[in-house]
């Protein structure tokens, strides 16, 4: 969340930023409630001072009548102090509720608008393939090669769940192995994360586990939720900690299952593996000093490009517009892969995103840094980025590497794990 002092000193700027990002929140109400809270705090402190003074007077009371009168006065003052304290707590809760709705501030170079206003800022090394045959989509290819079982998945867990079969299992594992190996070679520590996280951790990382638009599966009568991304447990892993500035940045790559309700998602472009309720992902996450986060964001974007260049998948790099930024993101880049079977005649589909969240998550999670020469502490910056979401990466590989006879070339980088060069129809 944003620093409250910053909000109060820059109320108009914060309100304008929220409007650009499509978030409706009454910033003036935050300022008004904070003024009331400060008044209640001052009142409580003054009443406490008076009550302490009365306590001293009781000890030197001349007689019992005076003592009883002072005791009654002290009791009244403490009751008033408690009421002022309760008012302060109530106002604090109201402010915090509004404060957590506010999105992060926005990088000045981020384009303003919605999905169609995003800027394309680059392309991958692999060109969009020119196919002299009618390409199949990944579901048709999956049927030919016996790769997916959506009907069986629906019988087990409902629509949006599936079984991977045969070569799809090897391909899924190969993508995980490749991404983790690549990132480990770049200084990232591999981590296998819990699939559950406390509600406080979700809220700290900017995810809303409640409400009609939530993407989170919550476990009834508990404070636990299935994680939508490894960003959640990786961010919470160091919550409440003070990190040594000299050891930053800390780089992690987290392997997790991801669970999402995908409420409201439907349509031809979302079919098959593109939008499901459970998938596997390797996620990059970093804790940095404030002056390191911009460089780390560019590093994560470059790593995503390296991974998809190695997979020989055509993609474009998108600088996401204000209306599509998640609440914690100061700036976000997406990689969109070309998918020949998407839509009516092929289209781009998001396969990765990487966000610089500055101190927005760290402030709520209370992750700070301190150097050997520093008296106080500072909030760190946090960043996250998709290395591989295996389902969508599989779509891009199958559809771009298919051949006219229905066989599928396996990207060279994955062959040691997949165990073959070409997937052939059985």
Curated annotation (Swiss-Prot):
Q: For L-serine, which residues are the binding ones? A: 229-231, 283, 386
Q: Which Pfam families match?
A: Seryl_tRNA_N (PF02403), tRNA-synt_2b (PF00587)
Instruction: Quote the SUPFAM superfamilies the UniProt record gives.
Output: Class II aaRS and biotin synthetases (SSF55681), tRNA-binding arm (SSF46589)
Q: Where in the cell is it found?
A: Cytoplasm
Enzyme Commission identifier(s): 6.1.1.11
Q: Which UniProt keywords apply?
A: Aminoacyl-tRNA synthetase, ATP-binding, Cytoplasm, Ligase, Nucleotide-binding, Protein biosynthesis
GO aspect biological process, one term: selenocysteine biosynthetic process
Report one GO cellular component. cytoplasm
Enzymatic reactions: tRNA(Ser) + L-serine + ATP = L-seryl-tRNA(Ser) + AMP + diphosphate + H(+); tRNA(Sec) + L-serine + ATP = L-seryl-tRNA(Sec) + AMP + diphosphate + H(+)
Q: Name one GO molecular function term.
A: ATP binding
Where ATP binds, per the record, is at 260-262, 276, 350-353
Q: What cystine linkages occur within this chain?
A: none
Q: Enumerate the PROSITE patterns for this protein.
A: AA_TRNA_LIGASE_II
Pathway field of the UniProt record reads:
Aminoacyl-tRNA biosynthesis; selenocysteinyl-tRNA(Sec) biosynthesis; L-seryl-tRNA(Sec) from L-serine and tRNA(Sec): step 1/1
Principal cellular location given in the protein's record: cytoplasm
Regarding protein family, the annotation reads: Belongs to the class-II aminoacyl-tRNA synthetase family. Type-1 seryl-tRNA synthetase subfamily.
Query: Which HAMAP family would you find in this protein's record?
Result: Ser_tRNA_synth_type1
Q: Assembly state and interactors?
A: Homodimer. The tRNA molecule binds across the dimer.
Q: What does this protein do?
A: Catalyzes the attachment of serine to tRNA(Ser). Is also able to aminoacylate tRNA(Sec) with serine, to form the misacylated tRNA L-seryl-tRNA(Sec), which will be further converted into selenocysteinyl-tRNA(Sec).
Q: What is known of its domains?
A: Consists of two distinct domains, a catalytic core and a N-terminal extension that is involved in tRNA binding.
Q: What is this protein called?
A: Serine--tRNA ligase
Give the originating organism. Rhodopirellula baltica (strain DSM 10527 / NCIMB 13988 / SH1)
Task: Write the gene name.
Answer: serS
């Amino acid at each position: 969340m944003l620093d409250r002092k910053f909000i109060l000193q820059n109320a108009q700027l914060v309100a304008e930023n929220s409007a650009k990002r499509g978030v409706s929140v009454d910033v003036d109400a935050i300022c008004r409630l904070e003024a009331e809270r400060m008044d209640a705090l001052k009142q409580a402190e003054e009443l406490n001072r008076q009550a302490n003074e009365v306590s001293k007077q009781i000890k030197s009371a001349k007689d019992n009548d005076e003592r009883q009168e002072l005791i009654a006065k002290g009791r009244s003052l403490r009751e008033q102090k408690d009421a002022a304290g309760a008012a302060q707590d109530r106002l604090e809760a109201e402010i915090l509720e509004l404060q957590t709705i506010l999105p992060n501030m926005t990088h000045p170079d981020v384009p303003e608008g919605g999905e169609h206003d995003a800027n394309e800022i680059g392309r991958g090394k692999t060109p969009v393939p020119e196919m002299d045959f009618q390409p199949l989509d990944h579901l048709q290819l999956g049927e030919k090669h016996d790769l997916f079982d959506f009907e069986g998945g629906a019988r087990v867990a409902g629509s949006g769940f599936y079984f991977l079969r045969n070569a799809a299992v090897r391909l899924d594992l190969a993508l995980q192995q490749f991404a983790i190996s690549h990132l480990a070679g770049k200084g990232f520590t591999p981590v296998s994360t819990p699939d559950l996280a406390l509600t406080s951790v979700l809220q700290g990382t900017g995810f809303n586990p409640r409400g009609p638009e939530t993407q989170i599966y919550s476990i009834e009568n508990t404070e636990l939720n299935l994680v939508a991304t490894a960003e959640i447990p990786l961010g919470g892993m160091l919550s409440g900690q003070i990190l040594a500035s000299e050891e930053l940045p800390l780089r992690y790559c987290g392997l997790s299952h991801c669970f999402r309700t995908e409420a409201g998602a439907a349509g031809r472009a979302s079919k098959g593996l593109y939008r499901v309720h459970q998938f596997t992902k390797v996620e990059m996450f970093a804790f940095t000093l404030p002056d390191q986060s911009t460089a780390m964001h560019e590093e994560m974007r470059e790593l995503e490009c390296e991974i998809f260049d190695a997979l020989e998948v055509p993609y474009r790099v998108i600088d996401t517009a204000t209306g599509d930024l998640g609440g914690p993101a100061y700036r976000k880049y997406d990689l969109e892969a070309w998918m020949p079977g998407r839509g009516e005649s092929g289209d781009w589909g998001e396969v990765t995103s990487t966000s610089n969240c500055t101190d927005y998550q760290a402030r709520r999670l209370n992750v700070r840094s301190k150097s050997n020469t520093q008296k106080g502490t500072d909030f760190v910056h946090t960043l996250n980025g998709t290395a591989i979401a295996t389902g969508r990466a599989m779509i891009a590989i199958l559809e771009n590497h298919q051949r006219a006879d229905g066989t599928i070339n396996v990207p060279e980088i994955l062959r040691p794990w997949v165990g073959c060069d070409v997937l052939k129809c059985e």
